[in-house]
From Swiss-Prot:
InterPro entries: Asp/Glu-ADT_sf_sub_c (IPR036113), GatC (IPR003837). Keywords: ATP-binding, Ligase, Nucleotide-binding, Protein biosynthesis. This is Aspartyl/glutamyl-tRNA(Asn/Gln) amidotransferase subunit C. The gene is gatC. NCBIfam families: gatC. Pfam families: GatC.
């Protein structure tokens, strides 16, 4: 696959990058160089290689899903300008 100047201009427009008309040939050449490197990856034999996400084994620590009130009600309501009966009190905005 080869990138021409019109494709390079389209990519620049999609990326919201202003590229002058005289810089398009160089941009197209850079895109072609990048695509060449990517094509080299297609030549690598990866048969039998297990896909991996990280070079170090990482596991997420799991915890049980439990519902709680957070035990923060008094602390949260202390910041409210008006709190009544454990709730935020706000002025009526709809008639």
């Amino acid at each position: 696959m080869s990138i021409d100047q019109s494709t390079a201009a389209k990519v620049a427009k999609l990326a919201r990058i202003k590229v002058e008309q005289d810089a398009l040939p160089a941009l197209a050449a850079e895109f072609n160089t990048i695509l060449g490197f990517i094509e080299q990856l297609n030549e690598v034999n990866v048969d039998g290689v297990e896909p991996m996400v990280s070079v170090t084994p990482m596991r997420l620590k799991r915890r049980t899903d439990g519902v709680s009130d957070g035990n923060q009600q008094a602390k949260v309501l202390s910041n409210a300008p008006d709190a009544r009966e454990g709730f935020f009190a706000v002025p009526k905005v709809v008639e």
